[in-house]
């Protein structure tokens, strides 16, 4: 499956010389859209509105928690706010990434303790989320490179 992540270029030139928006091409081709809850919320909400008005649109919306972006800025993502947002748009979204924990601090080498703690924290978030969202089967658990494979069982 091909997934179009982010907003990308705003215009595309078709072979016949006409211009159209890249968003329109994605809609026509049915590309799944991966958009970050906080960083791309405007674009995400536009897609939600479009999907509600055009149920025939084959595009699958996938929502990322924005955990990595928040981590790079030294910020925290509020889990309950994310759940509240999920519950407002779950009717047109295909999947939601759980709110995962990135070990350590951006720009620093994480400790073995931080690396061990992060997947446990992520798993607790996942369990909390599936108890509090309207759509538990749409929540994707996240596994990071370097984490113990026991978290995949």
Model-derived features with residue positions:
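Short beta-strand/loop segments at the ligand-binding rim of alpha/beta enzyme cores
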Residues: 58-63, 132-140
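SIR2/sirtuin NAD+-dependent deacylase catalytic core
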Residues: 125-129, 135, 151-153
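Glycine-rich phosphate/ribose-binding loops and adjacent secondary-structure elements
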Residues: 137-153
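Non-catalytic, usually N-terminal nucleic-acid engagement modules in DNA/RNA processing proteins
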Residues: 1-127
């Amino acid at each position: 499956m091909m997934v179009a992540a982010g907003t990308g270029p705003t215009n595309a030139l078709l072979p016949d010389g006409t211009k159209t928006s890249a968003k329109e091409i994605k809609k026509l081709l049915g590309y799944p859209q991966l958009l970050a809850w906080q960083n791309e919320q405007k674009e995400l909400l536009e897609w939600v509105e479009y999907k509600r008005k055009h149920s025939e649109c084959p595009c699958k919306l996938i929502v990322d928690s924005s955990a990595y972006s928040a981590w790079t800025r030294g910020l925290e993502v509020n889990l309950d706010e994310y759940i509240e947002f999920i519950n407002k748009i779950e009717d047109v979204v295909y999947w939601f990434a759980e709110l995962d924990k990135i070990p350590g601090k951006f720009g620093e080498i994480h400790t073995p303790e931080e690396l061990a703690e992060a997947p446990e924290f992520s798993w607790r978030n996942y369990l909390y989320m599936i108890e509090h969202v309207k759509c538990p089967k749409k929540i994707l658990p996240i596994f990071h490179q370097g984490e113990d494979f026991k978290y995949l069982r």
